[in-house]
Swiss-Prot record:
Transmembrane annotation, as ranges: none
Keywords from the UniProt entry: Cytoplasmic vesicle, Golgi apparatus, Membrane, Protein transport, Transport
Protein name: AP-3 complex subunit mu-2
Subcellular location: Golgi apparatus; Cytoplasmic vesicle membrane
Domain MHD: 176-417
Chief localization: Golgi
Amino acid sequence: MIHSLFLINSSGDIFLEKHWKSVVSRSVCDYFFEAQERATEAENVPPVIPTPHHYLLSVYRHKIFFVAVIQTEVPPLFVIEFLHRVVDTFQDYFGVCSEPVIKDNVVVVYEVLEEMLDNGFPLATESNILKELIKPPTILRTVVNTITGSTNVGDQLPTGQLSVVPWRRTGVKYTNNEAYFDVVEEIDAIIDKSGSTVTAEIQGVIDACVKLTGMPDLTLSFMNPRLLDDVSFHPCVRFKRWESERILSFIPPDGNFRLLAYHVSAQNLVAIPVYVKHSISFRDSSSLGRFEITVGPKQTMGKTIEGVIVTSQMPKGVLNMSLTPSQGTHTFDPVTKMLSWDVGKINPQKLPSLKGTMGLQVGASKPDENPTINLQFKIQQLAISGLKVNRLDMYGEKYKPFKGIKYMTKAGKFQVRT
């Protein structure tokens, strides 16, 4: 299946490679570099690239390309999902997944990759099992290993490897028993210049941090589970219970994990939390243009919109911009023609605005179309789809755990046409 794995930074340098079968020459990545040059952005590189003797499958996360090399046809999503699992494992082990961190922990990285694949086929991909096989690096363990010459490889077989719940090790004990769940929704939308919604959808996840003693059995119920589409679960979830009762029943892994991901595509269920009033005008035979935008809240259930950043790619004919923001700071790059306005929080009583003039090339024709406006924002304690957790119950253990639910909505690809 997977012959080799190459890690490539955004500059095109291969800084780590791992081979499970025969060694594949680095020259195979030349096909990937050619595709990278053709793509305008890193995210636009094709995930599957055929070559005369191999297939290259890649994911781009944390400014790193994870490129798998295979020689036989396999389901592409199978390989791509494994690559995402590799990234998540690195993040779980080291806190962050970045080029410097991977280089600093290169021995542990190779040990983890050796356990995750056996002769090119996925073997141990659960973080709990991997942490028993390969101990996560700590300052103390690094010092001890340096002095004694030992490694991070565990000296015992994982207790959960052969059990019916391989994602959870046995004998887990905590002084404070707690279970926290984060409902995070990302809204993608296109708004036309009249303010009507062209398309809108929500991608959501529920991330969990569970630190419970023993072998607890949890059930999580929702107030309105029917609005969830295209749901994908962690293997711990009992699917038949969800199909029949729309209740999540599971024995959780120990620590951090993603319980489920879901999709809300019905546009009548997608509320648009912000609006943009805009007035952008270019005149023929004039060296000046007018620019004015105002951002305000809409359908936020009284929650504050924060972390607002407005960006817009201006036409090539714009030489400079003289703008005044009512709040926040703005920048305009005359080379890339990119306007960026860091708004911060939106106060409903005093809506933020950015207005002024644009300097245009003398004699240049009027642009064919106005620029689009892209928004970034986040709203704490709000799931924009209306999803709400009803209750969390625990069975199989007698103690009473601490429980908490947190909601957050953030912008994905949120575009306003002008």
